[in-house]
Amino acid sequence: VPQAKHLLIGSTRSGSGKSATILGLTYNLQAKGYKVGYGKPIGTFTTKELPEAAERSEADVEFIKQTLSLPQSLLRPTLLNLDRSALQRRLSGEDTADYSDKLEEYKEIIEGDIVFLEAPANTAEGAIFGLSLEQMAVHLEAPILLVMRFGSLLVVDHILMAKRRFGDRLLGVVINDIPDEQYETAIEILHPYLENQGIPVFALMPENRTLRSVSVSEIIEQLGASILCQPENIDLGKIMVEELKIGAMDVSSAQSYFRKSYNKAVITGSSRIDLQFAALETSTNCLILTGRPFVNEDVAHKAMELGVPILAVSKDTLSTVSIIEGCLGQVRLHEGVKVTSICEMMGKHFNFDRFLKLMNIKTLAKV
């Protein structure tokens, strides 16, 4: 029986879009009739030492499993969660396990045409356990697909260094989050350059504001906010916020300032009724009030009419901004609108024929 082919999905920094890439690839390959497996050998480490880090890592695994209806037979177990206590046990000599042996057991599971293994946040993480991206690629004799956020044309340096490091193990790259104004440059200059360096480019993905947005229900959860006004028949999990604006100026300046942004949340003081009205006259998806948890009756009426929820937070403005910006900077997959967007984008921009050929997976007859 032929063994399932493993492919490591890695990146040089966290937040590059590995989980999203796996989701989009799996969905589209399933639609083509392939049996796809998934695993995350090493759970996510967080420098902030959030107690829910391991849970979040597990939640991502669980979410991908549920969303793609993956049976247990197609899942590879997580070998450890990379947190402070795991590191301390390793450093003190209490944990002497050979994780490469545990990784070898993946090879014995034959179910699936291809198995995507999500690597740690960057190329170094997990090395103390023998589970860095490169170490896993060697143990499993598996190729690496590198997922990179564009940032700027300087992304090429990181890709070239990865090629030097991984050599022929680097199957190719996916570059995502390319701003519209740089997309043509990426296609006409970056793509051919990388191909000439022997680095296959499977996809150049344009920036997608939906993916970097956050739902109002997620904002409520992260801020511990209370709801002062919730329009009827509005699902807060489906109202997406793409930008954040702070209202602390005079009202005439505020109007032009607010008009420049779409699908935004506006943070302002509960006493600034003038700014609340100004925000509601532009493309605002959520009002967040600081200070006294109070909303003016006329503002509430207008918000109900427009379908805009109003929240109250007890935190100061700076902390509130910091938390929401953290949410906006990360692609949290757990929202249906994002899943649909990812799967459609991957179907449109990813070169599946070339990918399957380089993975030596035979093309199935079209269903």
Model-predicted segments: where are they?
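N-terminal phosphate/diphosphate-binding loop that engages ATP/GTP or pyrophosphate donors
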Residues: L7-S16, A20-A97, Y106-K107, Y193
